[in-house]
Amino acid sequence: LGLVAAGLYRTNPNDTILPPSNVSLFSDVSTVGFYMLGIRGTHIFPQDKYRTDYTVYFYSFPCDYWGMGYDMGNDDSNKSEMKRWQARIKGSFLFHLGSNFYIGPMVSYDYVIGKNVERPELLNGMDRHTWNLGAGFSAVYDSRDVLTYPHQGLYINLTQCFRPRFMGNDYAFSTTELQVDAYQEVWKGAILAEDFRTMLNFGNPSWGMMALLGNSNSMRGYYEGRYRDKHKIEAQVELRQHIWKRNSLTVWVGAGTVFSKFSNIRSRHILPNYGLGYRWEFKKNVNVRIDYGFGKAGQSGFLFSINEAF
């Protein structure tokens, strides 16, 4: 059973030029023991002087685990079970520098527990209970016309988070994340959207903080975490076509890979991704999203969410 809710609002209702802030609430409960509750959004202050991006969620679910590295995830015999519990609090406060540029501090807290681990040797001796506290900065360029359903513009987000040992982290490492999105209207009712993203972990990340392929935003259709390593690179292109009234359809193609260091990148390790989706306009510029994604060797998955994947 899933529940999603979303809202748009302006901190100054009289300023029609100010982009609307957005907030999304999401939750899931299943009969197999999965539950999740979270909230995320962007709060834009009057005159767009500041912005706050935030994500808070926790979940618990029985999951499959293959180990770390492309080769481990690619081997079906490594599939094992565990119960994973995770909580995350992540936020940034950005100052508007002008000309669509924003920069400011960010903080992140993660707490991960692995219970009932069927094959503990796949954790490579790492603790089953880990937590990480980090701080850093985010630099953003954002010329999108609408944050939740862009028709045109460019979005670039570079985030650097440090998790040093003196902050109490048992696993000390730093994370560099880059996301680049572009949007163009190609014909009547059609939007072409491109997305590139990478996560690079330098140091000693725990099994629960590795870069994971597969989620509701990228590499849709892959089991999240089957392919995990210190680093990942992903890219996708999506065509969004309005059909009739509140109804739209999408198709996408993409690819991604995980690796422990750049010298280990191999063309044969690049994983394909493609799929199609349906959009129902819940309210202006807010879509309910249903996607079905496909991956390597028959891997596939159904996703239900709010707002676009990127």
Where are these regions (language model features)?
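Membrane-embedded beta-strand positions of outer-membrane beta-barrel proteins
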Residues: A5, V23-S27, T52-V56, I103-V107, ...
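Outer-membrane beta-barrel "beta-signal"
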Residues: G136-A139, L276-F282, Q299-F310
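Transmembrane beta-strand segments that form the barrel wall of outer-membrane beta-barrel proteins
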Residues: L1, L18-T31, L37-I39, L154-F166, ...
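C-terminal hydrophobic structural anchor segments
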Residues: R240-P272
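Gram-negative/organellar outer-membrane beta-barrel architecture
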Residues: L1-D127, W131, L213, R228-D229, ...
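Outer-membrane beta-barrel channels and translocator barrels
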Residues: R10-N12, P46-D48, H96-N100, R144, ...
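Transmembrane beta-barrel architecture of outer-membrane proteins
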Residues: M36, R84-R88, N132-G136, G153, ...
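C-terminal outer-membrane beta-barrel translocator/porin domains of Gram-negative envelope proteins
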Residues: A135-I243
